[in-house]
From Swiss-Prot:
Entry-linked InterPro entries: ACOT13 (IPR039298), HotDog_dom_sf (IPR029069), Thioestr_dom (IPR006683)
Record keyword Hydrolase present: yes
Family: Belongs to the thioesterase PaaI family.
Protein name: Putative esterase PA0474
A Gene Ontology molecular function term of the record: fatty acyl-CoA hydrolase activity
EC number of this enzyme: 3.1.2.-
Record flagged with keyword Hydrolase: yes
Enzyme class: hydrolase
Keywords annotated in UniProt: Hydrolase
Length: 134
């Protein structure tokens, strides 16, 4: 049985890729911004025993993309046109990894968001994304 921190619920949407990597969880923070999270498992790790950069990129893209899509009423799907990820630390098996998102700007066709990936107080990565409303 996986230990999930209080306040987190299963992620409200999924996909074949997320089903392979998950389970993913989410909640809103005190500023009503989306937080997406998962518990790091061996399947998420590289040969060095830490969470793979591709997983961190996927987690950032999921968190930022969902935050952007659900920042509009009604929610609207958006397409990632740019994603930047800066690695600042590592996540290990058993770590609870959270992506704290922030919507920076919503335009008519383009939107911008940023995120910080944390394991507890430890910063693992920072990310920014640009999204297009098709």
């Amino acid at each position: 049985m996986m230990n999930v921190p209080e306040g987190f619920q299963p992620l409200f949407r999924s996909s074949p890729l997320l089903d392979l990597l998950g389970p993913f969880f989410c909640r809103q923070d005190a500023q009503r911004q989306l937080v997406v999270a998962l518990r790091i498992d061996e399947k998420h790790c590289n040969h060095g025993g830490t969470a793979h950069g591709g997983l961190l990129s996927t987690l950032a893209d999921v968190g930022l993309g969902y935050a952007m899509a659900f920042s509009r009423e009604p929610p609207q799907p958006m397409v990632t046109v740019g994603l930047r990820l800066d690695f600042c630390g590592v996540a290990r098996v058993g770590d609870w990894l959270e992506v704290h998102t922030r919507v920076d700007k919503l335009g008519q066709r383009m939107a911008f968001a940023s995120a910080r990936l944390h394991s507890g107080e430890r910063l693992v990565a920072s990310a920014s994304g640009v999204f297009h409303l098709p």
